[in-house]
């Protein structure tokens, strides 16, 4: 029977947790600090909420209730991370040797991507050092050039339009079309822009020696400009959260660089078609049926990521929309077949979107209301509030530092805060699209080499920044609020400007590329 997280936490702090897994012993110092500050954050956060709640109930105004709700959502997210993310599972970089030569089908779904991108990917697929394998180019774009390219490389070419079929269910429908016309026991899925390493199958196939392993997801990586201004690398997720998910058997399929067992897919009727894209929902359904998932935390393929904010918005909107449709209409708390640990890990992802789209905008707006109204329910309680909130914040920062050690958690936090417009829209869209009413889908990376952004892409951010810069001065000049309250509130305004300013600067600055990472050179 699995031990509860806090029991494991206690025995690890006492130095009595067996160090059996790869890198467990080396990771122990980081893990113990992460545990300590996680527990401290839980205690301080709970104490802060216990102190804050009576003040809000005493005042009974809508903005104050919204502020309390935002604090509770944030605490729930932090709390789940504190409980479930401290222990990671590692794997040896050489992977596992297969006990036999599993027949593998490689699926490369396409839908109108530039020919040079598809050509680079297929040329790399040709160099994959594994047999037996069959490659299927699944072209929903029905491109004659792609067909000629696939045939010249000795690959199978399948196209739903040429077969007289509609493009129903987009990528998931395309993959299911390939599933019907292939027979390999394992299936490697690669997006049209994902350039695989020659040893990708050699390192992943061996994990299927183990019973009930349904899929193995390798770490995602991308060709990125210097500084990665939009944090497309997402090291917090790919280098920490997924390792924690691995330990909990809750690995999220990313839809590319992933190998599936055909038996699993056929058992559930193919790739999931309920959502916009198949990855998250397919893994969610597979795990609820009692199968196992594995995360291989090393880069075995590299692809394109959005280089302008419009592309980032479109991609993150789709991710958030799919996740929140599950939250509203197939919530993990009520999902049969998932363990409580798996439920918590899925809820972390869902709560991060709720915090970004709903809670954070409340934090941005509350100080502005104080400038306008000249009143705060915290008036007269500034000192205890400052002490409790700063202690809670400091513990949270230290917790994130050790949970996501050297993974740029501050950059990830700022990006999550800055994506509030698109996440709020995705949450609302998810509510309006129950089962049977699927949202529309648009393919990403059809124009992958975009450059500098435009100011209107960050209009909401510029609006908040402008208001936080001007309203304190206007409120002081007009006498709307007392100078002490304006000064106290200005601390929050400064923090909000600091958080949102990063994305504004990233959009207005032209990306700089190193030769090895420049997509124009990689993809010709």
What is each stretch, according to the model?
Residues 276-282:
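Acidic donor-binding loop at a coil-to-helix junction in glycosyltransferase catalytic cores
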């Amino acid at each position: 029977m699995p031990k509860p997280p806090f029991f494991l936490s206690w025995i690890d702090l006492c130095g009595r947790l067996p160090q059996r897994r790869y890198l467990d012993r080396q990771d122990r110092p980081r893990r113990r600090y992460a545990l300590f500050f996680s527990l401290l954050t839980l205690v301080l956060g709970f104490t802060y909420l216990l102190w804050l709640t009576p003040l809000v109930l005493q005042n009974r105004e809508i903005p104050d209730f919204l502020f309390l709700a935002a604090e509770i959502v944030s605490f729930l997210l932090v709390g789940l991370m504190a409980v479930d993310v401290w222990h990671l599972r590692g794997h040896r970089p050489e992977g596992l040797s297969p006990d036999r030569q599993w027949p593998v089908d490689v699926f490369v779904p396409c839908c109108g991507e530039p020919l040079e991108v598809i050509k680079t990917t297929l040329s790399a697929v040709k160099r994959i050092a594994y047999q037996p394998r069959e490659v299927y180019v699944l072209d929903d774009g029905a491109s004659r050039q792609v067909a000629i390219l696939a045939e010249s490389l000795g690959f199978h070419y399948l196209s739903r339009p040429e077969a007289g079929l509609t493009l129903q269910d987009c990528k998931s429908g395309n993959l299911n079309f390939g599933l019907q016309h292939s027979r390999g026991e394992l299936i490697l899925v690669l997006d049209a822009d994902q350039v695989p390493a020659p040893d990708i199958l050699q390192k992943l196939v061996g994990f299927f020696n183990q019973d009930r392993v349904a899929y193995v997801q390798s770490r995602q990586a991308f060709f990125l400009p210097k500084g990665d201004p939009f944090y497309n690398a997402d090291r917090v997720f790919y280098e920490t959260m997924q390792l924690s998910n691995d330990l909990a058997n809750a690995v999220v399929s990313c839809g590319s660089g992933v190998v599936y067992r055909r038996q699993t897919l056929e058992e559930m009727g193919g790739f999931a078609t309920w959502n916009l894209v198949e990855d998250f929902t397919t893994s969610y359904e597979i795990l609820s049926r009692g199968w196992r998932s594995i995360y291989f935390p090393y880069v075995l393929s590299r692809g394109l990521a959005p280089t302008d904010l419009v592309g980032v918005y479109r991609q993150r909107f789709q991710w958030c929309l799919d996740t929140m449709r599950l939250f509203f209409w197939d919530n993990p708390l009520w999902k049969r077949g998932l363990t409580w640990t798996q439920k918590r890990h899925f809820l972390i992802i869902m709560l991060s979107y709720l915090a970004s789209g709903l809670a954070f905008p409340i934090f941005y707006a509350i100080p502005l209301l104080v400038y306008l109204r000249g009143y705060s329910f915290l008036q007269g309680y500034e000192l205890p509030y400052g002490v409790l909130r700063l202690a809670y914040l400091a513990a949270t920062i230290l917790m994130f530092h050790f949970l996501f050690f050297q993974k740029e958690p501050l950059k990830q936090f700022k990006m999550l805060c800055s994506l509030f417009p698109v996440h709020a829209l995705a949450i609302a869209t998810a509510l309006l699209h129950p089962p049977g009413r699927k949202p529309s889908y648009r393919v990403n990376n059809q124009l992958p080499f975009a450059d500098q952004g435009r100011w209107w892409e960050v209009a909401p951010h510029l609006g908040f920044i402008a208001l936080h810069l001007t309203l304190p001065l206007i409120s002081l000049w007009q006498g709307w609020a007392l100078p002490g309250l304006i000064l106290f509130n200005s601390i929050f305004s400064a923090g909000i400007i600091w958080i949102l300013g990063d994305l504004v600067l990233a959009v207005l600055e032209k990306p700089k590329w190193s030769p090895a990472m420049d997509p124009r050179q990689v993809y010709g």
